């Protein structure tokens, strides 16, 4: 297993994981875990070969003060505080997989992750906003 650790001042150096399917999103204590599986089959580089050499990646976001999710569908949205209401989050994403399509860092250094929901769900997409103090990539 290969580790990459990014402190808050190095977040812009991270790989953004565009167009990768997240097979699991969970939160434990003050840590958000996102797992990407079959990376060596999904994203193809310019040379026609898989972009990622590793098969699996788990990203561990160590949360400093907050982590929330906004689910979107046409004219409505739903807000969930992941640190307080993670059961509500699990109920909304039950049985789904997600396509990661955007990653942003705002002017305060906070992380914003955008995902499309791939299965039939009452919401189309969601964004996770958080104040992370450290991010750890676990490549397998």
What do the predicted segments below correspond to?
Residues 1-140:
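Surface-exposed, interaction-prone regions used to assemble/regulate multi-protein complexes
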């Amino acid at each position: 297993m290969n580790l990459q650790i990014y402190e808050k001042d190095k977040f812009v150096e991270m790989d953004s994981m565009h167009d990768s399917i997240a097979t699991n999103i969970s939160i434990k204590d003050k840590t958000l875990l996102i797992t990407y599986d079959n990376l060596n089959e999904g994203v193809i580089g310019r040379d026609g070969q898989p972009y990622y050499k590793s098969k699996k990646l788990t990203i561990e976001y160590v949360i400093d003060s907050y982590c929330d999710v906004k689910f979107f569908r046409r004219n409505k949205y739903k807000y969930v505080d992941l640190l307080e209401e993670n059961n509500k989050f699990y109920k909304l994403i039950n049985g789904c997989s997600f396509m990661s399509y955007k990653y942003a860092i705002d002017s305060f250094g906070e992380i914003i992750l955008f995902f499309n929901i791939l299965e039939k769900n009452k919401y189309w997409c969601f964004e996770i906003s958080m104040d992370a103090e450290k991010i750890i990539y676990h490549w397998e």
